[in-house]
Each structure stands twice: as C-alpha cells, then as structure tokens.
Amino acid sequence: MPKMVVTHGVVDVEKWLSFKAERAEAVAATGVLNAVDLAAQDGSNAVAIMGDADDPAAVMAALASPPPEVAATMERHGVVPPLMIYIEK
C-alpha cells in the first residue's frame, strides 16, 4: 500500500489538531488508513496528513470533488485550499 501525503493550509493549526479523531475517520472514508497529522514547525499554518492509500487514484478523485460530508468536515477543520497530493513511487 503506497504512502500518500496531502499538504494544505489551515486557518488555525491548534483548532485543526483538535479534530484529530474526527479527521482520521473522514480520511479513512476516502481510503487512507493509518493517518498521521503533521504541522509545520516554522509557525506557519501549513499542515500535512500522511497515510497508507489502498487506491491512490480513488483518494485523489475523492479529494478533487469531495462528498458533501467530507467537504463539511474540511470546512469545519479550517482547511484552506489548494491541497497538494504526494504519492510514494
């Protein structure tokens, strides 16, 4: 299962981190397991999520046009587009 990393900005890093459990469920629903949250150490609002993607193409499709419940979760967590997606090769 290839590793996948998604980076993006957030409105507030601490608020984003407070939703860790909820985000893990939402990310798992898109096909990413063992998700790990990462926050930039430079004080910026840049974050990343890393995990194992069973079907990277399906995950990328889900993120390109997220279902309403995923979009609502992203908004509640303060996600700021664009999302950059990296896949282990």
Q: Whereabouts are the PLM-identified features?
A:
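Short S/T/G/P-rich N-terminal loop/turn motif that feeds into the first structured element of a domain
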Residues: 1-89
